[in-house]
């Protein structure tokens, strides 16, 4: 389920109360939650005696402190409407945090996870718990993505709507579906196409890659400050796991943290491995995400516990 709002901080077995709470979150996830509910109800109709588990994309981020999740807007919008930072890709961030703890052999450490794909988000994680994340009330916030603008001055929306007679909904559709790498490059939202274009001398493709790496590195730097240093930097998802050019571009900004990539190790694609040098003050890992496994594990734990 995309959006658990402030109702859910963990996965849970679905019952009537859970369904009502998911319905309550529809204003926060208007595109996804209704579809999620359709699936839940269809399964209830076909398999009425089979337990169902809801795994929320926002749940992992519910450990953020107020200084990270509150927006500096009048308090009534938070109290009445639950407007705050929620974050997404939580199932992926949770999996990578757990798997990285196994790989480095300890539970207490500070890391930044870079989930980089067509949709991208970063999370600051301390001892396995999320302290901050780049997406916000919606997945539109944070770094620029395949077709999403990422962080943008709200007055841009006002300006475009006023000048071009565009509705707010249409403007948000533009920011979600026609912006990001697609808009900057004028070519594609696919990073493989951007790399090919940049190699062929397309300056707009190069700008898109430069902008992406720059913004990702800015978030890593900000989260290093928020965590008072980091021990591990992880890359995951389609771009993070497979695009050695983007990883190198991001890490080129992070020398001040003591990040040092091994150029040969960084050539790997889709493999679970360290790609930093032995001298790097921050371990840099590629950790392929496995959201399906995380969902299956949560489901098994809850269903087995319910049987006891």
Q: PLM features: what roles do these ranges have?
A:
Residues 1-3, 51-53, 228-238:
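Short glycine-rich phosphate-binding loop at a beta-alpha junction
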Residues 30-34, 51-56, 62, 112-114, ...:
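General beta-strand structural signal in soluble alpha/beta enzymes
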Residues 126, 131-167, 173, 237-268:
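Catalytic phosphate/nucleotide-handling subdomain of diverse soluble enzymes
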Residues 173, 180-184, 191-226:
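Adenine-nucleotide phosphate-binding core of ATP-dependent small-molecule kinases
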